[in-house]
Amino acid sequence: MIRRMEERDLPLIAELEKLCFSESWSYSILESGIHSPYDVYYVFEQAENILGYCNLRVLAGEGEVQRIAVHPSCRRLGLGRKMMDAMVEYAIREGA
């Protein structure tokens, strides 16, 4: 299930960042991002486990993917594509 990221997700997302990126975003960057009026964050959750997340920024009529991460053990299963589809749908709704 893809849903909007909530503040309670941040500790797990910060850990996922470290697994997926050599230059990971800090907890404080993630925290400020979910409160930004320009950013939308989604998580891919299955059986109460967060398997991935993504971030889209919509500004001045344009959408830009900022981040997309899938747990290494769950790659090549289509999770990234599903999150990308959710971001595209959001961007279209927002006029980007």
PLM segments and residue spans:
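Acetyl-CoA-dependent GNAT
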Residues: 4-73, 77, 81-94
